[in-house]
Amino acid sequence: MWEEPPISGTNGSGTIFFSGCSLSCVYCQNADISRGRSGRSVSIDRLAEIMLELQHKGAHNINLVTPTHYIPSLAEAIPMARKMGLTIPIVYNTGSYDNVDALRTLSGLVDIYLPDLKYYNVKTAESYSHAGDYPRIAREAISEMYRQVGAPIFDDEGIMRRGMIVRILLLPGRVAEAKLSLKYLLDTYGDNIYVSLMNQYTPMPGMAPPLNRKVTREEYHELLDYAEKLGLKNGFTQDFGTASESFIPPFDLTGV
């Protein structure tokens, strides 16, 4: 599983995956957990303990992946973990299909937001994730996330302590839409956030065109050229050819 350098650092990010998902992406790479086929129930006390265990192992942060539908539990577990001695940042890693009122309950609890901006167009969102309202909801959610954490703060080792990194996963045949998402982010937030341009899309079996193929080198370079044209300063890119099943983590319940 790839994370941006200020998140993964040298010791890695303490990742906790949550079963289920608020979206139904047809190309989902984590279907085993997103569709409820894998996972183990834990108490709020145990969740707080897991965070402490990850800190003890040297993780730079606690990385909560697809946590949207567990916000009430997290609003209890995070303060509990802090009282038990948790000092590293909390990362909220989300597809951005998040209710703003729910996000507000995490104000002061989350240090770093790591949201996706999957789609700019309603038709794409409906076709690929059965969520035509995604563009509006995601933009509203990202705005609330930024309100909470503001501009980025790093420690002396370059590890992010606070801030937001918005991810744009380039999908095959969707360069124009990725450009629109990137321009929206830069027009709205400028250099106050980081943007991660990702090419790691890995086609799952049975996908129809164009989702049945990887992103081409030309597609990714077109997006990077556009980012340079817009003057993107705070950004991350991936080496080309990173799309593979190595980016799909094994959900073996380790550490639960």
Regions found by a protein language model. Name each.
Residues M1-I112, N121-V122:
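Conserved Radical SAM active-site core
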Residues G14, I62, I90-Y92, Y113-P115, ...:
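Hydrophobic faces of well-ordered beta-strands that scaffold small-molecule active sites
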Residues Q55-M80, S127, D133, S143, ...:
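Conserved glycine-rich "GG(E/T)P / GGGxP" loop and the immediately following alpha-helix
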Residues S107-V122, N192-Q200:
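Non-cysteine beta-strand/loop elements that form the S-adenosyl-L-methionine
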Residues E126-E157:
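Anionic-ligand binding region
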Residues G150-V256:
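Auxiliary Fe-S-binding modules of radical SAM enzymes
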